[in-house]
Amino acid sequence: MENKTVIPHAKGLKGTIKVPGDKSISHRAVMFGALAKGTTTVEGFLPGADCLSTISCFQKLGVSIEQAEERVTVKGKGWDGLREPSDILDVGNSGTTTRLILGILSTLPFHSVIIGDESIGKRPMKRVTEPLKSMGAQIDGRDHGNLTPLSIRGGQLKGIDFHSPVASAQMKSAILLAGLRAEGKTSVTEPAKTRDHTERMLEAFGVNIEKDGLTVSIEGGQMLTGQHVVVPGDISSAAFFLVAGAMVPHSRITLTNVGINPTRAGILEVLKQMGATLAMENERVQGGEPVADLTIETSVLQGVEIGGDIIPRLIDEIPIIAVLATQASGRTVIKDAEELKVKETNRIDTVVSELTKLGASIHATDDGMIIEGPTPLKGGVTVSSHGDHRIGMAMAIAALLAEKPVTVEGTEAIAVSYPSFFDHLDRLKSE
C-alpha cells in the first residue's frame, strides 16, 4: 500500500493544468473501435488502470490494439472479428468495463468469464445481467448472477423495451450495446437523465439512435465504422482542482480542455450555487462533445441543498463536493444519492468516516449526508482512500486546509483515473 503525507497549503494554488482524458469516453472509444470495421485512432486517451483493463479485455477477445501513453490505435474487424477468449477477462477495478462488456459478450456465440478485484466482487451486476438474460443471454455467477466472477454464453438476442429502475448510464449502455446485435428494436427508459456519451459516440461511429425524452432506442443489425476520437479532459478529475481553487485562500486555477457535457456538468452548477467565482472560456465542440477552459478563484461559499435530477449528473463528484461543503457557511444537504452505496466503496460511509477524522461536522443519512460549515479541519491524523480513487483525491484536497500534515493511506488507487494527480497538485503549489 502506498501512503502520501499532504502538507497544508493555505498560501494559494496558482497555475494552469490540463487534466487527463475523460475516463468514460476513453473506455467507449476503445470498445466501439473494437466493434467497428476499420481503424480507430484515439488521442487524449486516459492511461489509467481502469481504461487499461478495457484494452486488455479486448486484446484477449482477439482485437489488435496498440497503446502508447495517450494515443491508441484499434484495428477493428467488426463484431464478427471478436474471438472466444482463451483466458479469463480481468476487469480489475473497473465497473464501466464490467457492465458494458457484459452487453457486448451477451451477443457473441461463445463462452467467456469475467473476474475483477475485491471491490468489483462486491458491486451489484444484476441490474445489468437480468435485462440481458431477458433478451436471451445466458449469464451465471455468484448470488444468481449478481456478483463476479460471471460466466457468459452469448448468442442471438431479442430486442427489449426496458424501463430502468435506477438512473445508471452503465446499465443503459450495456443494454443498448446488446441491442445493436439483437432482433428488432431495443429501448431503454430512464427515471432521470444520465450521461449520454454512449449515444453521442455511437452516432459518431455511424449508428442511428432515436431519442425521445428519457427513452433511447436502437435498431438491431447496425454496423460501426472506425473513427478518429479526440478525448476531452475529464470533468470528474477537474472537479478536485475546481474545489481546491474555490476554497484554498489566494488561489486561481485554470483547467484547459475540460469536457462540459451537460449530463456530466452538475458540479459546475453546484459551484455557482455555492457562490464560486467560476469562468468558462473558449467553449467549443470537439468530437461531438462540448469542451471549455475553466478558471476558478477563491470564493466566499454558502451551503446548498443538492438532490433530485442533478444527482446522476454529479454522482462521482459528491466526495469532493462534501469537502467543499465543510468550508461553506451554513448547512449543505446531499440527498437522493443512494447510488453512492454501490460505487468502489460505500461512498456515503467512507466520506463521512474520513472527513469526521479531520474534524468536519458531517453525518450520514439513508440517501446522502448533511454537512455543517465552515469548520476548521485538523491535521496530524491518518485518513484512508479505502482503495477508492475518488476518496483518496478528496482527502488529499481536504488536507490542504488542515492545521497539520495529513497522511492519506492507499494513494495507489488514484492511478485508476488520475495517475498525475500529485504531480499536478505540486505544480499548483509551486507556481
UniProtKB/Swiss-Prot annotation:
Positions annotated to bind phosphoenolpyruvate: 23, 95, 123, 170, 347, 390
InterPro entries, alphabetized: Enolpyruvate_Tfrase_dom (IPR001986), Enolpyruvate_Tfrase_sf (IPR036968), EPSP_synthase (IPR006264), EPSP_synthase_CS (IPR023193), RNA3'P_cycl/enolpyr_Trfase_a/b (IPR013792)
EC number(s) reported in the record: 2.5.1.19
GO cellular component, one term: cytoplasm
Subunit field text: Monomer.
Family (UniProt): Belongs to the EPSP synthase family.
Protein name in UniProt: 3-phosphoshikimate 1-carboxyvinyltransferase 1
Organism: Halalkalibacterium halodurans (strain ATCC BAA-125 / DSM 18197 / FERM 7344 / JCM 9153 / C-125) (Bacillus halodurans)
Gene that encodes the chain: aroA1
